[in-house]
Design a protein with these regions (language model features):
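Compositional signal for N-terminal targeting/processing segments
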Residues: 19-435
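Bacterial N-terminal signal peptides
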Residues: 8-16
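Sec-dependent signal peptide recognition
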Residues: 2-8
Length: 435
């Protein structure tokens, strides 16, 4: 079952979820009067609050209801659409095309030609080979694609035997003072799993499970985002300060605090760049660049966000439609003339670029969830909705009431329910109904 068919079977009015492109996207859209900016901002903030509280239905469908919109394609604000799409990905595990957004940058024709002629090697093997030569590995993500977080867990598993035992995550909500941050991370280790207060993106069950399983492996968590950035005055200055502050915090809290340990750093796309990003004018140094300078360590930098099926930072060329043919069955690293190839936003700014296989659905769920150690399990019949739509959530029975679900699926009364993908162990269930 393809993504569009999955959403159609669930009765949702969504925009197309095919490859990203700069060309106009044809889709059925009901014209609606656009809300005021104040109304949009209020709905956006409420959606964030609902997601942090685990109210996924309110954060997604409720967002549309507050704006008096019948379907997501009526959203004209790209940031509000991204917020809606992020919450939906927490329930479906797949990203959604944003029709309110144009291409962010142009890809030089030479890069497209190189991509068409590229070869590929298995990603984990190449990452492990190169990770032996350094003490720091930096892996990025597309914030709207949970697939990236599942691959991050694969990388964490593969690197652990090499001595990698510190996991620094940009999304972790820490503290400005180092002592307070250390205490907060110790509490996280004691819990063994993330709570909603752990950070903004941990409402995604896949991200929360990546952290849970990494802690179980013995990784020590580190948070390092300390700057509340004000982009209103000068965005480039603000971004540069944020990148430097991140690198300084990582130097103190990871590199210096654990001098004999190796470190895996998990970041948003831009921060992995070791050189200013040419596609954006090259005017701002990124965290990886600063950390390389201050630590004296040349990190292995890996981009998996740029070749996502629906990248957050959108090129004017559908790069994934070319690259996915290089990775029919497993995640691969691109090569050209015997050297790693990088294209798109981070071309020339990272060491490796990963492309993942095209989405395959099994019982309505992405097959890559199996790589997280999940077992397919039909939804108990007693939990299926008699009418309307219902979010069916699975929690580890031992987790508290404020835990993040280990899995969840959206089901409708008039269609087959996707199966749950569950870890081993006792499970308790919860439901959220769409009014």
């Amino acid at each position: 079952m393809r993504i569009r068919a999955l959403f159609a079977a669930l009765g949702w009015s969504l925009v197309p979820t095919g490859h990203a492109t700069s060309a106009p996207q044809a889709h059925a859209s009901v014209q609606a009067e656009q809300p005021s900016q104040e109304t949009l901002n209020d709905a956006y903030r409420q959606s964030i609050a609902d997601a942090r509280a685990g109210r996924y239905i309110a954060a997604s469908f409720g967002l549309l209801d507050r704006l008096h919109l019948k379907q997501s394609s009526q959203l004209s604000d790209p940031d509000v659409f991204d917020q809606w799409a992020q919450v939906m990905s927490c329930m479906t595990n797949v990203p959604t095309f944003n029709p309110a957004k144009d291409a962010d940058f142009k890809v030089p024709p030479a890069q497209v030609a190189d991509l068409r002629n590229a070869t590929a090697v298995p990603a984990l093997e190449e990452i492990v080979k190169r990770a032996r030569r350094t003490r720091i590995v930096i892996l990025d993500e597309n914030h709207l694609d949970p697939r990236n977080r599942a691959f991050a867990l694969e990388v964490a598993r593969a690197l652990h035997p090499l001595g990698y035992s510190v996991l620094a995550i940009e999304a972790l909500k820490g503290a400005a003072e180092d002592d307070a941050e250390r205490a907060k991370m110790q509490a996280l280790v004691a819990d063994g799993h993330a709570r909603p207060s752990a950070g903004y993106y941990f409402d995604d069950p896949v991200f929360a499970d990546f952290l849970r399983q990494s802690l179980a492996l013995g990784y020590r968590p580190v948070s390092y985002e300390t700057t509340r950035t004000n982009y209103a005055s000068d965005p480039k200055v603000a971004q540069g300060q944020r990148e430097k502050d991140q690198a300084d915090a990582l130097l103190r809290r990871a590199v210096t605090a654990y001098p004999k340990q190796k470190i895996l750093i998990y970041v948003g796309e831009h921060h992995a760049a070791e050189r200013p990003i040419a596609a954006e004018g090259g005017g701002v140094r990124m965290m990886a660049d600063y950390l390389k300078e201050t630590s004296g360590i040349d990190p292995l930098t890996i981009d998996q966000a740029g070749l996502s099926p629906l990248p957050m930072n959108r090129p004017d060329v559908d790069l994934y439609a070319i690259a996915d043919k290089k990775a029919p069955r497993q995640s691969m690293v691109l090569m050209r003339r015997g050297q790693p190839l990088t294209v798109g936003l981070l071309a020339g700014s990272v060491d490796l670029q990963v492309v993942h296989p095209p989405l395959a659905l099994v019982h309505g769920r992405p097959s890559w969830l199996h790589e997280m150690g999940r077992i397919t399990s039909p939804v108990p019949r007693r939990l299926l909705p008699a009418k309307g739509s219902r979010l069916i959530q699975a929690f580890l029975a031992a987790d508290g009431n404020d835990a993040i679900p280990v899995d969840q699926v959206l089901a409708t009364a008039d269609g087959p329910a996707p199966w749950l993908m569950l870890p081993h162990g006792p499970i308790r269930y919860a439901i959220q109904d769409r009014p």
